[in-house]
Amino acid sequence: SVQSAQLGNDALSKSIHAGIIGFIIIILFLLLVYRIPGLAAGFALLSYVELMLLALNGFDLTLTLPGIAGIILNIGMAVDANVIIYARIREEIAAGKTVKSAIRIGFKKATSAIVDGNITTLIAALVLLWRGSGTVKGFATTLAIGIFIQLFTSLVISRGLVWMLYHMGFQKPAFYGKERVKRTIKFVEKR
């Protein structure tokens, strides 16, 4: 069946609107849970969106619904990368490291997991580009381009922002969130 141009524009508009709402909720969550690193992640995610739109424009690609899906998937992957990094930082702080050391070690420990996850997704995107048809290729193209951009924003821009905030005076462990206390219930002892 053929859809009207108005129906396609309406779906595109609603997708963009939903993406913006989701983006705001994600940033609020990152700020609440990760504090200062969450602020850095928010700016890194904004950088991702800006760079992605510049790349789409630079490659003269049209923004379609499958393209938006690729962008949103990459935003999710970027959030995941930042969560992995900041969880590592919190673990290092909880283990008694200084904030400076925790930032350095946290990024170092998280990098290989983030790169590995993105390589597997890139392989899938390349297979979709190779074997897919029209809309699938549009999704795969934005996904592949977005992987490189979100790796850059997660591992370079986010790192730079965290260090910048650290050097601006945000050096207390409390600014980086607390490792949650793991509560265990000792059922055997309660008898």
Question: Residue ranges of each PLM-predicted region?
Answer:
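Interfacial segments of transmembrane alpha-helices in multi-pass membrane proteins
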Residues: N9-T64, W130-G134
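Hydrophobic alpha-helical transmembrane segments of membrane transport and translocation systems
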Residues: A55, E91-R191
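Small-residue-enriched core segments of transmembrane alpha-helices in multipass membrane transport
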Residues: G38-D60, I71-G76, F139-S154
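Membrane-embedded alpha-helices of multi-pass transport/permease systems
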Residues: V79-N82, Y86-I89
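A cross-kingdom feature of multi-pass membrane systems that activates on extracytoplasmic/periplasmic
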Residues: S1-A5
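Hydrophobic alpha-helical membrane-associated segments
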Residues: I25-L31, M77-A81, V127, I149, ...
